[in-house]
Amino acid sequence: MGDSRDSRSPDSSSVSSPPSGQRSPPLAPSAAAMTSLPPITSAVNSPISSMGSPFSVISSSLGSPCLPGTPSVGYGPISSPQINSTVSMSGLHAVSSSDDVKPPFGLKPLSSHSPGPMVSQKRLCAICGDRSSGKHYGVYSCEGCKGFFKRTVRKDLSYTCRDNKDCLVDKRQRNRCQYCRYQKCLAMGMKREVVQDERQRSVQEERQRNKERDGEVESSSAANEEMPVEKILEAEMAVEQKTELHADGSSGGSSPNDPVTNICQAADKQLFTLVEWAKRIPHFSELSLDDQVILLRAGWNELLIASFSHRSITVKDGILLATGLHVHRNSAHSAGVGAIFDRESAHNAEVGAIFDRVLTELVSKMRDMQMDKTELGCLRAIILFNPDAKGLSSPSEVELLREKVYASLEAYCKQRYPDQQGRFAKLLLRLPALRSIGLKCLEHLFFFKLIGDTPIDTFLMEMLEAPHQLT
């Protein structure tokens, strides 16, 4: 008896015999058969164990059915034909991944892998079974059923069923019977009051937006009262009339062969009208006299360039001076320009380059956007109220006036050109070009032959102290 035990393989000792009083499994192998079959553990560890999901499902679900030392499964020898068939090689080959292998009664199956979080979170529409896009009106539903229920409640629609009011509502047939679909929405828990509350909120939001728009209109009208664009336009028109009078009386004596001289003469005459224009701009005369002089001295060149650039919109490849003369691009590049610049002939190219910049960066842009005189006047008022001018006694007051012009111009653009949302920004983008070109013109053009030998500060002071000279 002891010799027979010693002659068995080591693994066969792990196979326990059934306790006394219990019937042996009908298919349990005999000792002779055990010696001819490979050990169970070796079968588990053999390449067959890597066959795939069928074997792993069986082994993980049941453990080692023939081993009594397995603590996790509190069962004795199991006589299930399913389990006994797994011992034989032929039984292993008969199992496929599609077979429904069930554990013994009372044994909870253990899946080989737990479902991922995305799988567990997928929900279907409670009405038609399509993929749910979330919880709508109290029920997980798809976008189609959500929209159907929303339209039905908001429009207070009523439907009738052509059959027995028990139509199938699924993903394919949900549009066949609107009555049954709506009844199923209600039956699954969709709430009409949620749709109605949503409608009320949207109405309230629309009212709030209307109030905000009304507030914008009120604020823009308030800004216009503080800096009325009508007054700014009046100042522009008064200066334009004065310019036309100058042009009628003095155009005959100018020489078109000397464009720089013509420009300087135009600047000379325009300084008189510029001071009159500034006096007509709202709140400018309320500043101290010294601050008025500082602002005009800091911005007069940009103010004049803005004026003749806008005046030249109708001229092709040239500018129209206040004297009424046209200066063509070719004239600015001609040799006659160098007559004033005897000391440095290099200035010829500089003057031609400045002229080209005026045409491309100012005249052309103003023409393309069809800048009107009100917008021109507001841009010039922004240039005039320069809080960065050196020597101001009250720069904060000047900055406040500039901000009022900004607000009035923006309100004017919204009211006059409602379809051009970027127009206000386009207008402001002309200011850097005016600044840059103005600095270049100061270097090369306008100080020549300017009001004789009179210092510009003295001239401006006398003009500002004088009463209005434009009628």
Swiss-Prot record:
DNA-binding region, as residue ranges, is located at 122-197
Tissue expression profile of the protein = Shows uniform expression from the blastula to mid-gastrula stages. At 12 hours post-fertilization (hpf), expressed ubiquitously but more weakly. At 24 hpf, restricted to the ventral diencephalon, pharangeal endoderm and trunk and tail mesoderm; mesoderm expression is in medial cells of each somite along the dorsoventral axis, forming stripes. At 48 hpf, expressed in forebrain, eye, midbrain and anterior hindbrain.
Composition bias type Low complexity, residue spans:
10-25
Keyword RNA-binding listed? The answer is no
UniProt region (Disordered), positions on chain: 1-34, 196-226
Q: What is its main location?
A: nucleus
Please, one GO biological process term?
retinoic acid receptor signaling pathway
Entry text on domains = Composed of three domains: a modulating N-terminal domain, a DNA-binding domain and a C-terminal ligand-binding domain.
Output this protein's name.
Answer: Retinoic acid receptor RXR-beta-A
Q: Source species, please? A: Danio rerio
- Chain's gene name: rxrba
